Amino acid sequence: MALVLHCGSGNKNAFKALIAAEYTGVKVELTKNFEMGVSNKTPEFLKMNPLGKIPVLETPEGAVFESNAIARYVARLKDNSSLCGSSLIDYSHIEQWMDFSATEVDANIGRWLYPRLGFGPYVPVLEEFAITSLKRSLGALNTHLASNTYLVGHSVTLADIVMTCNLYYGFVRILIKSFTSEFPHVERYFWTMVNQPNFKKVIGDFKQAESVPPVQKKAAPPKESKAKEAKKEAPKEAPKPKVEASEEEEAPKPKPKNPLDLLPPSKMILDEWKRLYSNTKTNFREIAIKGFWDMYDPEGYSLWFCDYKYNDENTVSFVTMNKVGGFLQRMDLCRKYAFGKMLVIGSTPPFKVKGLWLFRGQDIPKFVMDEVYDMELYEWTKVDLSDEAQKERVNAMIEDQEPFEGEDLLDAKCFK
């Protein structure tokens, strides 16, 4: 009998076995019309996996569950498969990277994503920990891939299949470009893998996530008691204007506009400034800085300095940089209305964190102060443009001038 993979289409854990099958030539059939919550609750399915989890591979010798175990089984059905390496050390390194992918990459993507989708409580501190852990893991992966095309050896192995499938889930759900661009070798590796014919045949075409999913808010409990009371009080004989009442009650409320969209039009087009900033590669001060002040509208926008209040805690460089990166991720909700530069300053700890922000309007937007908890960790000072020293400081921060205020720059990040 052919191998049967019990799972819905589009599942990244099923992709692992299906891609391995493309490399080995093993025939694996994906069950048709699989319905999660129904198909995996049948007595037949529960005999194969008592927990009802997917995927499950049905073989002539019995069922196999857990996606990595299934992928191993498919890969080893072909003698001397290159997917499993050519030596004991290759095999060990493949297992090493498969474990790393599961515990350091996939797990941290899930810890960041699932609470935002409502699968568990959303706790900002735990999210920050998940993001920091994921960045640390991707940093290690990035270092390895700086000098390696594949995770192990000189061709695709099972380690690459598992890693790519786990990264795929992150790329399509939560890992936006501004996040992944910090790991250029991981990006290069990922896009190279998913465009390999055997990967592409299974995964198909897709786009990288453009925004981090918003936190799902719990729906208000239905007011059953009031509805029942109203029902009792209503006279049976009295005619009810059913259609009109239902239309009024069910009419969707118009989505409230962002207060910043109601401000008077500004001569400054923020996207034009962002394009100028991104496209200026030489003579930055003469082109980009001059262009900024030519565009700047002091009535429609305001500039703000921010200084981290707890710099004495910034004793580890990568933790400090990850802290700033997490802040910028959470600022994504105001990308339409803001531009920012964040600098990590100093060659030895404790490191200083300072920033410059351009916001629509004359104040820091209220929805940013309400939603981004990092805001209260910084001291905010509005830039006084009548002070030439402050204006020059703006220039230096936009330009990533080094040294900055007499100190080395450890890192500079841009929010645009």
From Swiss-Prot:
On the tree of life, the source organism's domain of life is: Eukaryota
Composition bias, kind Basic and acidic residues: at what positions?
221-245
Full protein name: Elongation factor 1-gamma 3
Boundaries of each EF-1-gamma C-terminal domain copy?
Answer: 256-416
SUPFAM superfamilies linked = eEF1-gamma domain, GST C-terminal domain-like, Thioredoxin-like
What keywords sit in the KW lines? Elongation factor, Protein biosynthesis
Region of interest (Disordered), ranges: 213-263
Domain GST N-terminal spans what residues?
A: 1-82
- GO MF terms, alphabetically ordered: glutathione transferase activity; translation elongation factor activity
Q: Which residues form the GST C-terminal domain?
A: 87-215
Membrane-crossing residue ranges in chain numbering = none
Quaternary structure per UniProt? EF-1 is composed of four subunits: alpha, beta, delta, and gamma.
One matching Pfam family? EF1G
Please describe what this protein does: Probably plays a role in anchoring the complex to other cellular components.
**Mind telling me which PROSITE patterns this protein's record contains?**
EF1G_C (PS50040), GST_CTER (PS50405), GST_NTER (PS50404)
